[in-house]
């Protein structure tokens, strides 16, 4: 078994799908998205310093941390929601940055994008991709 990687921060890219093509690009299927940041540490908090939401064209739609950083306690989860009515597109994404005061386990960062309708439910699970790390 490989040893756990211990780091003090990351910048992550996380795709979400607020609209997906349905019927060969003629109709868009609207979806909502839940983004979850799970602190996998047993004793150390992490701090979310950036949670930016971009549309398919790379333009910022929302800054979820306008009021300041968020502390995520050990084994706790913080989540963000993109409503069903959002029209940011199939290529929408988040940039998420977190830091810690010491070397810690990396968090689990995921999005669940879904549309639940009778006889036509769609759900997509995505995980964050590391862009930059801090040791």
Predicted regions and their residues:
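Transition segment at domain starts
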Residues: 1-26, 119-135
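Hydrophobic beta-strand positions
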Residues: 37, 52-53
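Intrinsically disordered, low-complexity Pro/Gly/Ser/Thr-rich segments with frequent PxxP/GP/PP motifs
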Residues: 55-95
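Short, hydrophobic/aromatic beta-strand segments
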Residues: 44-51, 62-64, 106-110
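Asparagine-centered strand-capping/turn motif at beta-strand->loop junctions
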Residues: 37-44
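Short, solvent-exposed loop/turn segments enriched in Ser/Thr/Gly
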Residues: 27-34
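Terminal connector regions
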Residues: 85-135
């Amino acid at each position: 078994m490989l040893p756990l990687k211990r780091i003090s921060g990351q910048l992550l890219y996380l795709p979400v799908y607020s609209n997906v093509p349905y019927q060969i690009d003629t109709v868009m299927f609207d979806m909502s998205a839940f983004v979850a940041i799970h602190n996998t540490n047993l004793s150390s908090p992490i701090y979310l310093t950036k949670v930016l939401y971009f549309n398919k064209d790379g333009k910022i739609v929302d800054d979820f941390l306008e009021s300041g950083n968020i502390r995520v306690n050990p084994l706790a989860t913080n989540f963000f929601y993109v409503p069903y009515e959002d029209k940011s597109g199939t290529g929408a994404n988040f940039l998420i940055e977190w830091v810690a005061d010491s070397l810690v386990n990396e968090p689990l960062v995921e999005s669940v994008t879904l549309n639940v309708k009778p006889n036509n439910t769609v759900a997509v699970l995505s995980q964050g991709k590391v862009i930059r790390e801090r040791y």
